[in-house]
């Protein structure tokens, strides 16, 4: 019964936001509360639900919010930081350079989007990647009249592939859950990742051709490129301090990669330094923060609402129940195929549950079963990270809300547009893993 309620809650949520009957903030808050109350009432009739008590629901929700609080704080100050950097004109030269390079060709823009995202996402953090890449590319998409849905899709897929580096979350979780070395998981997956990257470039080429056909190669007056500004607030431009802002941002990125301090603290410090150096007038500092507060609070509000969703999902035992039931339905005759089965399951399972729930709850059970057929834990770990491009479309991923907010697109629209391409990207990576020996298609007892 817990499994049915968990699946019902997730499917109901997905339906409401994809059909735009509810906003993500409202759905993430109300739907889990309603299903938790349903579970409480059904607990009088089903023993499997008798452990759910009304007085415990608040603790479950608060626990979920606490877990996502650092992420919410980080996003609040990160959005404000990059918004201030845009106002100062930090990214104006990069946009001008890209503008001169693409010369109004949508095909070059889509391919450039992928390249930029692949490079920036090497730091392993999706939120930072989206903030930098959207800041650089969105003005160009708007100027050419290209669809921001295409931009968001290409960025998400590129980030999903590059997030498989050893310092990225999925590989580290899979390795720690199965007690294997992250480098042993990652190195054999390099070629499959290259295959997936090649596929994303093909997608970018295809969409670039479509946008070129729709819009044509637009003639941009490059001679006026020096007048191009990303910011809509020219009074906040600080071109003479660009060297300082560049240095500050580079140091911030290095500190993020080296984990010198928690991300939220680093962005808080960097934001305060940026405000003090660039804007001496306290009133101007207040005005700029107020100007960007709307977009920041919109994203952060969704993050805290997601805490309620995940808190109830985990606290009621729905996640554990779903993982056990899904593992149990795999017939014993399919045991030798557990590696590709795990790769396929990683798509829906990491969509419907968090990475932590999948890698620490489901993967060890699958890996233990696979051992009986001669499939090693490291091979299972490689198979388990294949579904990450689909995972990034999950309503449980905070950075996806950030991407949609920055790009100015609806979360449900993004899901509908990108889901088929995310699945195909995962399948290409899985095929690469099978062909190049990342994990076996079929295995027997050693």
Where do the PLM segments sit?
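Membrane-interfacial loop-to-helix junctions in multi-pass transporters
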Residues: 1-4, 66-72, 98-112, 143-151, ...
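Long, contiguous bundles of hydrophobic transmembrane helices that form the permeation core
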Residues: 3-9, 28-31, 35-39, 43-48, ...
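Transmembrane alpha-helix interface/packing and boundary motifs in multi-pass membrane proteins
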Residues: 13-21, 82-83, 116-125, 156-162, ...
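Membrane-helix interface "capping/anchor" motifs
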Residues: 15-26, 141-150, 280-281, 290-291, ...
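Core transmembrane alpha-helical segments of multi-pass membrane transporters/permeases
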Residues: 57-92, 118, 264-265, 272, ...
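Hydrophobic alpha-helical transmembrane segments of multi-pass integral membrane proteins
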Residues: 74-77, 103-136, 329-373, 377, ...
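Re-entrant/interfacial helical elements at transmembrane boundaries that shape
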Residues: 93-95, 128-140, 168-178, 322, ...
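Membrane-core helix-loop-helix motifs of multi-pass transport proteins
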Residues: 139-225, 230, 235-236, 376, ...
């Amino acid at each position: 019964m817990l499994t049915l309620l968990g699946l019902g809650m997730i499917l109901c949520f997905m339906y409401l936001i994809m059909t735009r009957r509810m906003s993500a903030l409202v759905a993430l808050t109300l739907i889990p509360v309603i299903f938790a109350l349903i579970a409480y009432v059904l607990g009088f009739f089903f023993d499997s639900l008798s452990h759910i008590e009304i007085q415990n629901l608040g603790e479950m929700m608060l626990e979920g919010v606490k877990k996502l609080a650092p992420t919410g704080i980080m996003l609040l100050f990160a959005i404000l930081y990059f918004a201030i950097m845009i106002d100062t004109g930090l990214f104006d030269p990069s946009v001008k350079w890209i503008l001169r390079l693409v010369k109004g060709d949508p095909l070059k823009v889509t391919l450039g989007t992928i390249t930029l995202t692949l490079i920036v996402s090497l730091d392993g953090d999706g939120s930072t990647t989206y903030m930098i890449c959207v800041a650089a590319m969105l003005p160009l998409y708007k100027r050419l009249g290209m669809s921001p849905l295409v931009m968001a899709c290409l960025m998400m897929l590129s980030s999903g592939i590059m997030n498989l580096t050893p310092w990225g979350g999925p590989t580290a979780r899979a390795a720690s859950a199965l007690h294997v070395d992250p480098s042993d998981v990652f190195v054999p997956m390099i070629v499959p990742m290259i295959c997936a990257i090649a596929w994303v470039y093909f997608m970018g080429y295809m969409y670039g051709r479509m946008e070129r056909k729709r819009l044509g190669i637009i003639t941009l007056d490059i001679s006026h490129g020096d007048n191009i500004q990303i910011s809509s607030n020219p009074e906040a431009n600080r071109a003479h301090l660009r060297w300082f802002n560049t240095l500050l941002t580079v140091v911030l990125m290095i500190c993020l990669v080296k984990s010198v301090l928690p991300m939220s603290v680093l962005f808080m410090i960097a934001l305060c330094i940026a405000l003090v150096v660039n804007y001496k007038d306290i009133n101007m500092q207040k005005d700029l923060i107020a100007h960007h507060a709307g977009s920041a609070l919109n994203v952060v509000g969704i993050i805290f609402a997601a805490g309620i969703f995940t808190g109830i999902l985990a606290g009621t035992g729905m996640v554990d129940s779903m993982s056990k039931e899904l593992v149990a339905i795999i017939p014993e005759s399919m045991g030798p195929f557990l590696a590709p089965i795990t790769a396929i399951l990683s798509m829906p399972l990491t969509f419907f549950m968090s990475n932590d729930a999948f890698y620490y709850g489901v993967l060890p059970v699958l890996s233990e079963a696979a051992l009986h057929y001669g499939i090693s834990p490291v091979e299972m770990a490689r198979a388990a990270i294949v579904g990450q491009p689909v995972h990034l479309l999950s309503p449980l991923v905070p950075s996806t809300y950030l991407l949609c907010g920055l790009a100015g697109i609806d979360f449900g629209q993004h899901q509908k547009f990108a889901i088929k391409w995310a699945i195909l990207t995962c399948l290409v990576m899985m095929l690469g893993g099978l062909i190049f020996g990342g994990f076996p298609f079929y295995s027997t007892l050693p």
